[in-house]
């Protein structure tokens, strides 16, 4: 990558401003002041701005985050804090959520700067399953699991939901696995059968399960196996 492009990404400024900073001798490579933005960087080089190291990124990045309540999954929001607050990573604003959660929903969020990978997570064509832990206002009706297996009619939609698996933990606490991503789908499915979701926590996306060791607001890089599992055929 060219130095000027790298600095533009790292500093979040235009290349014109990067050129000004280079002329001001604020950038060094391996301890030497550089003024040309055309230099091609190599991964082992030590790039610094005002003496502060700038980390070179090799390839796309993938993380799992345990999202707490009160944060939105967009990268910018004028009214609410975003999940980027938790990501102590260079150029964090380049990351986006592969499958968002509502502000009051907690649990697994996948963060990446790989657009094709996130498309495989969210595209209906790939049928990526998601599992949620759901707390309900009322005890579950005996026929709800079968209704979800058959598909339910959501308000103001023509087609039934795809078959979903419902496992009862307690009368008002269940685990739901769906393979779609309709708007507010879990909440609307329970509303369609006369119940209401009180708490919603996502545990799994595809073969990626939220790490039990991650406290709310904590994150970790995905493993090579977890990254490769997205979009892989299930035999």
From Swiss-Prot:
Q: Give all residue intervals belonging to the S4 RNA-binding domain.
A: 1-68
Gene Ontology cellular component annotations, sorted alphabetically: cytosol
A Gene Ontology biological process term: enzyme-directed rRNA pseudouridine synthesis
Question: What is this enzyme's class at the first EC digit?
Answer: isomerase
Q: Which GO terms describe its molecular function?
A: 16S rRNA pseudouridine(516) synthase activity; pseudouridine synthase activity; RNA binding
Of which family is this protein a member?
Belongs to the pseudouridine synthase RsuA family.
- What does this protein do, in the record's words? Responsible for synthesis of pseudouridine from uracil-516 in 16S ribosomal RNA.
Known partners and oligomeric status: Monomer.
Identification of the protein by name: Ribosomal small subunit pseudouridine synthase A
Please report the organism this UniProt entry assigns to the protein: Yersinia pestis
Print the organism lineage.
Answer: Bacteria, Pseudomonadati, Pseudomonadota, Gammaproteobacteria, Enterobacterales
Q: Which gene encodes it?
A: rsuA
